[in-house]
Amino acid sequence: MKDELNKVVVYTDGACSGNPGPGGWGAVLLFDNGEKTICGGHPNTTNNRMELTAVVQALKFLDVTYVIDLYTDSVYVKSGITSWIKKWKINGWRTADKLPVKNLELWLELDKIVKYHKITWYWVKAHSGNLYNEKADMLARSQIVK
């Protein structure tokens, strides 16, 4: 009988004070046997970079292949990984406006990491009372160095 893959639910968020400015990211990983939180920050960044970093760091934390339900409140992240990235690759990592894709190194890293997992991507409305999205937001905000 085939082994069933490990499952995890992940909530990520990024925050920035000013854009650009100091920022933070946070992730809540919900395993069958408990919860793990991770977070970090950067002194000069953007909100989109922190949103993307949260997802990359959460996926890098996982040391084996998982079936993942991943929740983000970032349309940039969800649309980027589920839709835009296909065209960016075809266009030599350029946007529809022929401009270089911003945060390219993070998109390249995410593109590589997602191949190791079976991820279903979800968008969740920010600040709408979702417990784990709020927790990820709190973690991200806690890392903003002022």
UniProtKB/Swiss-Prot annotation:
It catalyses: Endonucleolytic cleavage to 5'-phosphomonoester. Binds 1 Mg(2+) ion per subunit. May bind a second metal ion at a regulatory site, or after substrate binding. It is found in: Cytoplasm. PROSITE patterns: RNASE_H_1. It comes from the Bacteria. Keywords: Cytoplasm, Endonuclease, Hydrolase, Magnesium, Metal-binding, Nuclease. Its EC number is 3.1.26.4. This is Ribonuclease H. It comes from Ehrlichia ruminantium (strain Gardel).
